[in-house]
């Protein structure tokens, strides 16, 4: 059930009067159309029963601030109680020296609005940057793919087998099931033998310990399956465990994590990081540096990600991209609908000098999407995804792209404020009357 939000100002102090109207976060909060979030997400709540929920603007604002400031759920809730600009951004009318909600409520809100709600936030971030703007952001765009790494440890068979044994023993202990042997003392020796496996003298011993660990894990799983009555609620768990125990080096569609079984292994040819474990994301950036699309995939060929990314951009903005430039990883596709796909290639003999220079400039400009991806990873939480499952993969990349666009709008607003102030001061107009 939605809680009624009061717009009654405080009799003694107003949060708006306390703050500087020149602050970029203050300016951004007045430029975002919060009513579109209210209208879109209100039907997701029950209007007749249940505890009154927190305001939609508060929850949306916290999600935006989290990726804008690159902090966790717990940290953004804690900072909200200390920062007056955060509270005004989330619709506060007076300063509240306490946390607005529990950090876990952000998890429920993300699951409630889903991927469609995140696309609405990204669409609003695009509108904030393009509203009343004469520049054509949809004439030429650039596309590139990167890996969004999942929050898992580096996967090895031994680590997975250890976790299987630990989980099985926990279920046996919680349900007081009979167990012929727990292998407690045996496992200590096996773990010791697996240490320092890279030393030439320990290699053979470590490989033998790996085989013993797999055997013990299989025994415990089979014994648990026999002792559990009906296996109700554990079917998926046993299926996952047997898949992990049966996979080898040449297996297809491997499981790299027990709590994130959808993670895939991607090799992008990097010297410092040969393999990355997560999922592939596609980023579409305009000529002016605005992110127009952000889609999540498994490990598809780059050329097969273009169509879905263009559809998302058209769905959010109602506009079509005329020309799309990508690197040589997108070879094989020349046109999708009305959008021409431009890939770097050997210059044609029939091209004039002007055409060659124009293409060269376009492909040089395409490289500008690389630092954009770098900022998404370093500043907006794209480098490591902490959200759960395939749904969390899509949510994280959409929120990171939206935060990037909102930060761009804040820089533009700050630049305009400084420029107007300098011009007014140069003409002799006092700065305190400027705003």
What do these predicted regions represent?
Residues 23, 60-62, 76-77, 102-106, ...:
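Short, conserved catalytic/metal-binding motifs centered on acidic residues
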Residues 322-391:
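Helix-centered, glycine/charged polyanion-binding patches within enzymatic domains
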Residues 1-32, 411-435:
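Charged, often Cys/His-bearing segments associated with DNA-binding zinc-finger transcription factors
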Residues 40, 45-52, 59-60, 67-134:
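Basic, low-complexity intrinsically disordered segments
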Residues 49-54, 84, 325-333:
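Acidic, metal-coordinating catalytic cores used for nucleic-acid/nucleotide bond scission
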Residues 93-262:
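Active-site- or DNA-interface-adjacent structural scaffold in DNA-acting proteins
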Residues 258-273:
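Flexible, glycine/threonine-enriched loop-and-boundary segments that flank and lead into catalytic domains
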Residues 270-316:
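Electropositive, glycine- and tryptophan-enriched low-complexity nucleic-acid-binding patches
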């Amino acid at each position: 059930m939605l809680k009624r939000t009061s717009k009654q100002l405080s009799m003694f102090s107003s949060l708006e009067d306390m703050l500087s109207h020149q602050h970029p976060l203050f300016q951004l909060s007045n430029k975002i159309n919060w009513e579109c979030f209210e209208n879109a997400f209100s039907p997701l709540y029950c209007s007749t029963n249940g505890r009154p929920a927190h305001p939609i603007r508060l929850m949306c604002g916290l999600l935006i601030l989290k990726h804008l400031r690159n902090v966790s759920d717990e940290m953004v809730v804690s900072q909200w109680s200390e920062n007056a600009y955060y509270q005004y951004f989330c619709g506060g009318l007076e300063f509240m020296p306490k946390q607005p909600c529990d950090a876990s409520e952000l998890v429920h809100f993300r699951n409630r609005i889903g991927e469609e709600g995140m696309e609405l936030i990204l669409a609003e971030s695009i509108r904030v940057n393009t509203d009343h703007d004469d520049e054509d952001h949809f004439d030429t765009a650039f596309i590139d793919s990167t890996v969004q790494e999942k929050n898992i440890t580096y996967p090895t068979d031994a680590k997975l087998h250890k976790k299987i044994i630990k989980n099985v023993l926990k279920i046996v202990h919680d349900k007081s099931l009979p167990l012929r042997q727990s292998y407690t003392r045996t496992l200590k020796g096996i773990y010791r033998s697996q240490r320092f496996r890279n030393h030439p003298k320990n290699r053979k011993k470590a490989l033998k310990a790996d085989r013993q660990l797999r055997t013990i894990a299989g025994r415990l799983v089979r014994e648990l399956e026999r002792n559990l009555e009906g296996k109700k609620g554990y079917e998926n768990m046993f299926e996952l465990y047997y898949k992990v125990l049966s996979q080898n080096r040449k297996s297809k569609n491997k499981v790299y994590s027990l709590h994130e079984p959808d993670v895939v292994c991607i090799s992008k040819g990097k010297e410092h990081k040969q393999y990355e474990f997560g999922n592939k994301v596609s980023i579409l950036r305009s000529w002016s540096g605005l992110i127009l699309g952000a889609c999540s995939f498994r490990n598809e060929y780059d050329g097969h990600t273009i169509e879905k990314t263009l559809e998302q951009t058209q769905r959010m903005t109602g506009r079509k991209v005329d020309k799309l430039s990508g690197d040589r990883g997108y070879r094989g596709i020349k046109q999708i609908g009305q959008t021409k796909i431009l890939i770097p290639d050997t210059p044609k003999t029939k091209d004039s000098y002007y055409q060659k220079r124009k293409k060269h400039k376009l492909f040089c400009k395409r490289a500008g999407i690389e630092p954009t991806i770098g900022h998404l990873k370093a500043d907006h939480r794209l480098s490591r995804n902490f959200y759960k499952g395939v749904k969390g993969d899509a949510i994280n990349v959409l929120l990171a792209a939206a935060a990037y666009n909102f930060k761009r709008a804040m820089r533009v607003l700050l630049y305009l404020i400084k420029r107007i102030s300098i011009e007014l001061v140069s003409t002799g107009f006092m700065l305190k009357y400027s705003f």
